[in-house]
């Protein structure tokens, strides 16, 4: 193990190719690298597996927003299960390789993703809507109106 960084080394480095120079990682050769984590989540899927989703509640609805850059609506599936579970899933395919192509970087994520959310009792399951614009999926789940308790005035006798 060398303590001197190899700025021009690495799997995809070429001294004469300005796009292939890897950023030096001082912990790369240490025994505590994330090899166990890397084995369970391959690098090409790691970012996609953890698709970010925001969930906010307004007075009228529960609103979910998922960042899905570069995906088309045909590649995404939104489902509601009987037990009030909202499921957002999809798959981004790996770009087809041409034997004449030379890759300098391969950093964009690919693979499948799935996120599940248990919806509260007040969710109107039959009125869920989804829209996708500029790589952001928005799922709107309307809420049932909360009934105000009836107040009955009682006459006081005596």
Curated annotation (Swiss-Prot):
Chief subcellular location: cytoplasm
Domain of life the protein comes from: Eukaryota
Induction (UniProt): By stress.
sHSP domain: residues covered: 44-158
Transmembrane regions: none
Keyword list, A-Z: Cytoplasm, Stress response
SUPFAM superfamilies: HSP20-like chaperones
Subcellular location: Cytoplasm
Gene3D superfamilies per the UniProt record, alphabetical: 2.60.40.790
Pfam families xref list: HSP20
Annotated Gene Ontology cellular component terms: cytoplasm
Entry-linked PANTHER family: HEAT-SHOCK PROTEIN 20 FAMILY MEMBER
The protein's assembly and partners: Forms oligomeric structures.
Family: Belongs to the small heat shock protein (HSP20) family.
Annotated protein name in UniProt: 18.2 kDa class I heat shock protein
Organism: Medicago sativa
């Amino acid at each position: 193990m060398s303590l001197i960084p190899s700025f021009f080394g690495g799997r995809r480095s070429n001294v004469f190719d300005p796009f292939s120079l890897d950023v030096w990682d001082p912990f790369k050769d240490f025994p505590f690298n994330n090899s166990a984590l890397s084995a369970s989540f391959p690098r090409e899927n790691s970012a996609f597996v953890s698709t970010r989703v925001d969930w906010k509640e307004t007075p009228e609805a529960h609103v979910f927003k998922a960042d899905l850059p570069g995906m088309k609506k045909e590649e995404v599936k939104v489902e509601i299960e009987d037990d009030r579970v909202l499921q957002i899933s999809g798959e981004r395919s790996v770009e087809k390789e041409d034997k004449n192509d030379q890759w300098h970087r391969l950093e964009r994520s690919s693979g499948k993703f799935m996120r599940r959310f248990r919806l509260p009792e007040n969710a109107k399951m039959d009125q869920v809507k989804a829209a996708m614009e500029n790589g952001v999926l928005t799922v709107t789940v309307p809420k049932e109106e909360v009934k105000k308790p009836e107040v009955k005035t009682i006459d006081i006798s005596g």
